[in-house]
């Protein structure tokens, strides 16, 4: 559970770090959105270092959680209800994440 939570917090940091510049560019938001956006991306990079395995494995497993958090963002922030296809994609990516993240260590 701790691993999944760390991946989820990492995903939120990345999404916020990308969303704020997007708002500035796409929706004419304040240029000051770039400051918390940059800080959030720096936090994202630091959080990735807290995962205790090889970087490639971390990125692969993190990707599954990122998809789940992005779909939650779609629903909660963008106010777009996910489709059944979105939900199926989340299930499959989380299954892949679990296989990678929780494999036996030898």
UniProtKB/Swiss-Prot annotation:
It is a multi-pass membrane protein. Pfam families: UPF0060. Keywords: Cell inner membrane, Cell membrane, Membrane, Transmembrane, Transmembrane helix. It comes from the Bacteria. GO terms for cellular component: plasma membrane. It is found in: Cell inner membrane. The chain crosses the membrane at residues 2-22, 30-50, 58-78, 82-102. The keyword Membrane applies. Belongs to the UPF0060 family. NCBIfam families: PRK02237.1. This is UPF0060 membrane protein Bxeno_B1021.
